[in-house]
Design a protein with these regions (language model features):
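Sec-dependent bacterial lipoprotein signal peptides
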Residues: 1-17
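N-terminal leader/targeting segments and the immediately adjacent pre-domain N-terminus
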Residues: 3, 19-107, 136-141, 201, ...
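Structured C-terminal helix/loop/strand segments within mature extracytoplasmic catalytic/sensor domains
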Residues: 346-390
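Active-site-proximal alpha-helical segments within enzyme catalytic domains
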Residues: 226-233, 274-295, 352-368
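Active-site helix/loop module of the DD-peptidase/beta-lactamase fold
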Residues: 119, 138-178, 209-211, 236-273, ...
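Active-site Gly/Thr loop motif
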Residues: 257-258, 311-363
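Active-site SXXK
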Residues: 85, 105-107, 116-144, 171, ...
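Amphipathic alpha-helical interface segments
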Residues: 187-199, 203-209
Length: 390
């Protein structure tokens, strides 16, 4: 498969590269200042344990936190770790909220804590994928091979022979074949499709009016509008809007209430391609749900079949930050301590990441505000967190 070289940072997705300032040396030296404390149990459904209880070397984690405090890693707002089903680490750091019109896209300076909701940006896409899976599990949607127009009677006039072949799976894998320019153009330019989509009075019409440029299912074109289309399909099929559906079938069963979807203006449709605000501790529940085959506290929220289908490779990418793509999940092999760690992850602009490592039963969540620089998430994983796992 041929891919363009995408080089510009965009509003709806944050690249995660592995470069940053050089950290201090001394891999197993804890350094001075920070003292690790086991996370408290707050009644939110998480059982907690200490790092040593699950075989994680606390010294390397302490070194990481000292480096964040020393601004070696800047604008990291949270690091949360779940291992073996237990919440074993959470720390929060001050930094800037997202502000689209601010310098470096920074808004207000905030003292983040476990109750502070954070913008997840494009990590929201993986949540939308889960909603599609639930809609299929519940029988609202027949399957991923359904034509999108089976659920879009309002837009049937835009259907033609080529577009009739677009399926739900094509939207989930970013292979709809629709012409779309989102990765190789600045958000300040008039031809940036997601900006035009967001501000359209009818974003779905804007999307489906695009011509087909490749056969559906063959080429990867990152397309946030396609994810909002999935939200509209869930809405039509279930007769609940995305906010209602997610509360009933996902967030409610997870015991999550401190979250907020965003709404596109002037259309009023729910923004499913990005920007849900949620706490990192609750975001980790979502990652653990997929690590645990769709089960949370004994309840099967998403089918095991959907978890496996949505986190396997459909499109090979071979990019620096991802090897392949599933159903709105990225997949990557990490290398640390002469070991290979398979992962799937959700990722958003600025350093938002839900990294799931099935082989070692671990979930790591990051939030941050590195909107014009490379987020350090991958370096932190490979230099500190993965090597700390015994």
């Amino acid at each position: 498969m041929n891919l363009k070289k995408y080089v510009l940072i965009i509003l709806v997705f944050g690249f995660t590269f592995s470069c940053s300032k050089n950290p201090t040396s001394g891999d197993d030296e804890p350094g001075n200042g920070y003292v690790y404390v086991q996370p408290p149990e707050t009644g939110d459904g998480w059982q907690t344990a200490s790092l040593s209880d699950v075989g994680i070397n606390a010294n390397k984690i302490v070194q990481l936190i000292n480096n964040i405090h020393d601004s070696i890693y800047q604008e990291v707002h949270s690091v949360v770790i779940v291992k073996d089903g237990k919440l074993v680490f959470e720390e929060y750091f001050p930094g800037h909220d997202f502000g689209y019109y601010g310098e470096n896209y920074h808004g207000s300076y905030i003292i983040f804590n476990r109750d502070t909701r954070h913008n997840t940006h494009s990590a929201t896409k993986s949540i939308t994928s889960a909603l599609v899976g639930i809609a299929i599990d519940k029988g609202f949607i027949q399957g991923v091979n359904d034509s999108i127009f089976s659920y879009l009677p309002k837009y049937v006039s835009l259907k033609n022979e080529q577009k009739s072949k677009i399926t739900i799976e094509h939207l989930l894998t970013m292979t709809s074949g629709l012409q779309w320019n989102e990765w190789d153009v600045s958000v300040s330019e008039s031809n940036h499709d997601i900006v035009r989509f967001n501000s359209s009075s009818d974003p779905i019409h804007y999307l489906l009016s695009k011509p087909i440029v490749t056969t559906p299912g063959t080429n990867f074109y990152y397309n946030g509008g396609a994810v909002d289309l999935l939200g509209e399909i869930v809405k039509f099929a279930s007769e609940w809007n995305v906010k209602q559906f997610s509360q009933k079938y996902l967030f409610g069963p997870l015991g999550v209430s401190n979250y907020q979807w965003q709404t596109l203006y002037p259309s009023g449709i729910t923004c499913c391609h990005g920007d849900i605000y949620i706490t990192p501790r609750d975001l980790t529940k979502f990652g653990y749900l997929f690590l645990n085959n769709g089960v949370w506290n004994g309840n099967q929220i998403i089918s095991e079949e959907w978890v496996k289908k949505s986190t396997e490779t459909y499109i090979d990418l071979n990019l620096s930050w991802a090897d392949s793509y599933g159903y709105l999940w990225w997949l990557k092999k990490y290398f640390a301590n002469n070991k290979t760690y398979d992962s799937f992850f959700a990722e958003g602009w600025g350093g938002q990441k839900i990294a799931v490592f099935p082989g070692i039963k671990m979930v790591v969540v990051f939030t941050g505000a590195n909107y014009v620089s490379n987020p350090p998430c991958d370096e932190i994983l490979t230099r500190y967190i993965l090597p700390a796992v015994k």
